[in-house]
C-alpha cells in the first residue's frame, strides 16, 4: 500500500516536471518570436526611414508597402546610380542634406505636373507626390505597382511600344555596325560613359499622350471620359550599352526604363480661358476646317478672321511641320485632347510665327457626339523672315490648283452627260410642242362650203335652231371643249375646243338608199332640249366627244379642185361631185367598237397597239366624261386606240340605234314626258332621213 502511494507520487512529480519543462520551452519560444518580430519591426522601421519619403508617410506604412517601395527604390538606383551627382552645380564640400531636398520640392511645385519612372516591365519605380493633385492617387499607392493598372485599355499597346527598345538594336550590335541607336519617334541624346565598367548610356526622347485613371471630384478633375484623364507625357527612354568583350556576342544593351513628366491638359473650361496678348482662339470642324476666329488673330498674324474662315489649318502651317500637326490631329480625334508641338504659322505678307496649340474636342451638351474642335493658341515668337513668302495664300492671291488628268476626264464625262441630257430634254420638248401643234391644227379647222350646198350649224347653247348657209358662205361650227383631250395637254397649254357638227335637213334623202358610205346621225334632238337637269342640255358629242376631234374636208365643184383642211398635217381630196364631207368618229356605247362603212369596206376597230401620234386618234376614257352617271355606260366605253383595218365590214349598226339605246340607258331617270318627247324627236329625225357623208382618208 505504501509502495503504491510512493509510485503514484513519483509519477505525479514527473508529470509536473514535464509540464513545467514544456511551459518553459513555450515561454522561451514566445519570447523568441516576440523578439524576432520586434527585431523585424525594427528593421522595417529602419528600412522605411531610408526611403526618400517624408516621416509622416513612412511611419504609417505596412510591411508589404515598405518592401514594395524599397524594391522600387533599388531599381531606381540602376537608372540613376549616382543620384543627383554633380549635375546640379553643388560642390562636394557643401552640405547636401536639407538643401537638395528643399530644392527638389520647389522644382516639383514649379513643374505643374508629376514625374514618374517606369521599369521595362511596366512597374512604376518612382512617381512624385504631385500626382495626387492631377489624378487623385497617392504616391505610395502608385509606386511599385504596374502602370497598366492605371491607364486606359486602348493605350496599353502604345505603352508597351514606348517601353521597348527598337527591334534593330538587338539585331545590329553597336560594336559591329557603329550605327546610331534611336527610335523613330525619339531623338538620341549624348551618352554618358562609365569609366569603371566601360559602358555608356543613351537616352531616346519620347512624347506621348496617356489616358490615366482619375479619382478626383468632378469639379477638380477637369475633362475626364469614363474616369480617365488625358495626360501629356514627355521624357526619354534610358538604355545602357556594354562593349563587346570578345566572346562573339557583340555589345550588350540593357533597357533601364522610362523617365517622363506628366502634364494635365487644359480642362473642359477651355472656352473660358482669359486670352492674353500672345494668345488667340479658333473653332474648327473635325477635319480642321476653320469656322471661327477671334479678332486678336489679326494683330498676331495679319489675317482678318474672314480671310481664314472656310479654310483648313494645314494651309497656314509650314510644310516641314505638317506631319507633326497631322500626328497631333490624329491624337486629338482619338483621345479627345492634345498639345501640339511647336509649329510655324505662316503670316500674311510672308514669314511665320512659332505657335503651340492646346486643342480639345467639345461635345454637344445634348448628345455624346463630337461637334467641333476648340483650340487655344500661344504665339511664342515675333514674326520671322518677313519677306519670305512660302505660300501664295500669304499674299491674298490664290491661284487655281492644276487639275489632274483623271479630274479632267471626270469633268469631261460630266459635261458630256449634261449635254446629252440637255439634248434629250430639248428633243422631248420639241416632240411635245409638235404634238400639241399637230392637235391644235387638227382642232382649229377651217371649212369652205361647196356651192349649191347648205349646212345647218348647231349652236352650242341648248335650244338654239340651225340656220341654212348659202353658197360661198363660210361655215360657223359650234365649239365645245372635249374633256378627253385633258390627259394629252400640258397644264400650261390651253384646251382647244372640239367641233360639234350638225347635219343639214334633207327630207328627200332616204337612209335605205344611202346606207353605203353614210351614217345616220341622231343627236341633234338632244341639243334642242332644255331639261331641268344639267345633263339634259348636253349633246352626244359633249357626253362622248369624237375620238379624233375633227377631220373636215371640203371640195369645190368648180374645176374639181382640192382644198386642205387643218387636221394635223392631213389633207383631203375633193371629189368631183362637190359633196361636202366631214369625218367624225364616235364610240359605240353598246359593243365598245367603232363601225364605219363605205364602198371600200373600211371599218374602224380598236387597237391598243397603235401609236397615238401615228394614227391621230386619241384614246378615250370614261373617267374624262364629266356627265356620265351610269356605271353601265362607263363599262361600255372603250379606252383603246382606233385604227383603220382593211377587212370585210361587220354587221351594220346605225347611230340612230345607238342613240336610242344610249338615251334609254342614260336618261332612264327622267320623267315619262321627257322620254316621250325624245322618242317623238327621234322618230321625226328618222323620217327626215338626216345624213352625213363621211369620206374615208
UniProtKB/Swiss-Prot annotation:
Pfam families: bHLH_HIF1A, PAS, PAS_3. Gene3D superfamilies: Helix-loop-helix DNA-binding domain (4.10.280.10), PAS domain (3.30.450.20). Keywords: Developmental protein, Differentiation, DNA-binding, Neurogenesis, Nucleus, Repeat, Transcription, Transcription regulation. Transcription factor that functions as a master developmental regulator controlling midline development of the ventral nerve cord. Required to correctly specify the formation of the central brain complex, which controls walking behavior. Also required for correct patterning of the embryonic genital disk and anal pad anlage. Plays a role in synapse development. Residues 506-518, 621-631 have a biased composition (Low complexity). This is Protein single-minded. Residues 558-570 have a biased composition (Gly residues). Efficient DNA binding requires dimerization with another bHLH protein. One of its GO terms (biological process) is determination of genital disc primordium. Residues 406-446 are annotated as: 14 X 3 AA repeats of A-A-Q (approximate). Residues 100-172, 266-336 form the PAS domain. Residues 496-537, 554-584, 621-655 are annotated as: Disordered. Embryonic nerve cord. InterPro entries: bHLH_dom, HLH_DNA-bd_sf, Nuc_translocat, PAC, PAS, PAS-like_dom_sf, PAS_fold, PAS_fold_3. NCBIfam families: sensory_box (TIGR00229). The keyword Lyase does not apply. Signal peptide: none annotated.
Amino acid at each position: 500500500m505504501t509502495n503504491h502511494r510512493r509510485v503514484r507520487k513519483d509519477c505525479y512529480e514527473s508529470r509536473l516536471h514535464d509540464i513545467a519543462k514544456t511551459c518553459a520551452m513555450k515561454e522561451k519560444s514566445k519570447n523568441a518570436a516576440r523578439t524576432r518580430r520586434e527585431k523585424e519591426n525594427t528593421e522595417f522601421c529602419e528600412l522605411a526611414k531610408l526611403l526618400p519619403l517624408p516621416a509622416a508617410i513612412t511611419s504609417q506604412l505596412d510591411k508589404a508597402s515598405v518592401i514594395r517601395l524599397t524594391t522600387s527604390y533599388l531599381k531606381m538606383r540602376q537608372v540613376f546610380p549616382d543620384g543627383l551627382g554633380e549635375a546640379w552645380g553643388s560642390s562636394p564640400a557643401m552640405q547636401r542634406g536639407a538643401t537638395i531636398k528643399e530644392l527638389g520640392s520647389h522644382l516639383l511645385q514649379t513643374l505643374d505636373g508629376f514625374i514618374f519612372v517606369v521599369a521595362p516591365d511596366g512597374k512604376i519605380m518612382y512617381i512624385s507626390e504631385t500626382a495626387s493633385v492631377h489624378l487623385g492617387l497617392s504616391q505610395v499607392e502608385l509606386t511599385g505597382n504596374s502602370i497598366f493598372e492605371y491607364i486606359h485599355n486602348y493605350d496599353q499597346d502604345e505603352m508597351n511600344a514606348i517601353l521597348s527598345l527598337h527591334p534593330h538594336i538587338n539585331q545590329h550590335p553597336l560594336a559591329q555596325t557603329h550605327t546610331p541607336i534611336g527610335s523613330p519617334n525619339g531623338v538620341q541624346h549624348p551618352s554618358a560613359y562609365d569609366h569603371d565598367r566601360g559602358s555608356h548610356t543613351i537616352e531616346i526622347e519620347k512624347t506621348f499622350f496617356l489616358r490615366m485613371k482619375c479619382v478626383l471630384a468632378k469639379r477638380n478633375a477637369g475633362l475626364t471620359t469614363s474616369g480617365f484623364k488625358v495626360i501629356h507625357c514627355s521624357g526619354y527612354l534610358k538604355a545602357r550599352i556594354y562593349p563587346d568583350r570578345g566572346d562573339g556576342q557583340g555589345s550588350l544593351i540593357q533597357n533601364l526604363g522610362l523617365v517622363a513628366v506628366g502634364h494635365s491638359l487644359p480642362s473642359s473650361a477651355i472656352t473660358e480661358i482669359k486670352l492674353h496678348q500672345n494668345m488667340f482662339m479658333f473653332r474648327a470642324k473635325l477635319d480642321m476646317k476653320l469656322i471661327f476666329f477671334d479678332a486678336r488673330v489679326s494683330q498676331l498674324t495679319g489675317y482678318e478672321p474672314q480671310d481664314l474662315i472656310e479654310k483648313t489649318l494645314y494651309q497656314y502651317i509650314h510644310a516641314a511641320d505638317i506631319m507633326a500637326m497631322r500626328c497631333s490631329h490624329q491624337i486629338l480625334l482619338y483621345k479627345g485632347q492634345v498639345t501640339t508641338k511647336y509649329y510655324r504659322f505662316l503670316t500674311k505678307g510672308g514669314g511665320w510665327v512659332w505657335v503651340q496649340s492646346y486643342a480639345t474636342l467639345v461635345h454637344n451638351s445634348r448628345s455624346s457626339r463630337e461637334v467641333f474642335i476648340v483650340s487655344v493658341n500661344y504665339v511664342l515668337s515675333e514674326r520671322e523672315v518677313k519677306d519670305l513668302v512660302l505660300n501664295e495664300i500669304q499674299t491674298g492671291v490664290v491661284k487655281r490648283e492644276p487639275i489632274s488628268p483623271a479630274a479632267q476626264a471626270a469633268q469631261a464625262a460630266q459635261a458630256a452627260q449634261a449635254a446629252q441630257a440637255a439634248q434629250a430634254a430639248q428633243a422631248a420638248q420639241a416632240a411635245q410642242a409638235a404634238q400639241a401643234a399637230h392637235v391644235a391644227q387638227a382642232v382649229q379647222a377651217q371649212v369652205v362650203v361647196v356651192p349649191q350646198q347648205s349646212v345647218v350649224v348647231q349652236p352650242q347653247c341648248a335650244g338654239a335652231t340651225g340656220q341654212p348657209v348659202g353658197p360661198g358662205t363660210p361655215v360657223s361650227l359650234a365649239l365645245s371643249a372635249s374633256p378627253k383631250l385633258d390627259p394629252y395637254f400640258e397644264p400650261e397649254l390651253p384646251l382647244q375646243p372640239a367641233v360639234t357638227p350638225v347635219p343639214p335637213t334633207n327630207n328627200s334623202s332616204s337612209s335605205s338608199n344611202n346606207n353605203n358610205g353614210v351614217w345616220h346621225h341622231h343627236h341633234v334632238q338632244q341639243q334642242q332640249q332644255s331639261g331641268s337637269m344639267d345633263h339634259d342640255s348636253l349633246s352626244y358629242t359633249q357626253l362622248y366627244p369624237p375620238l379624233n376631234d375633227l377631220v373636215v374636208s371640203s371640195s369645190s365643184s368648180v374645176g374639181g379642185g382640192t382644198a386642205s383642211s387643218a387636221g394635223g398635217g392631213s389633207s383631203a381630196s375633193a371629189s368631183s361631185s362637190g359633196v361636202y364631207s366631214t369625218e367624225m368618229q364616235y364610240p359605240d356605247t353598246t359593243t365598245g367598237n367603232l363601225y364605219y362603212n363605205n364602198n371600200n369596206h373600211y371599218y374602224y376597230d380598236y387597237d391598243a397597239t397603235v401609236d397615238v401620234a401615228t394614227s391621230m386618234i386619241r384614246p378615250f376614257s370614261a373617267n374624262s366624261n364629266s356627265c356620265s352617271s351610269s356605271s353601265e355606260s362607263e363599262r361600255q366605253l372603250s379606252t383603246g386606240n382606233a385604227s383603220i383595218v382593211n377587212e370585210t365590214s361587220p354587221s351594220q349598226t346605225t347611230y340612230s340605234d345607238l342613240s336610242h339605246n344610249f338615251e334609254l340607258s342614260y336618261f332612264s331617270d327622267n320623267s315619262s314626258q321627257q322620254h316621250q318627247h325624245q322618242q317623238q324627236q327621234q322618230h321625226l329625225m328618222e323620217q327626215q332621213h338626216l345624213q352625213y357623208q363621211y369620206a374615208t382618208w
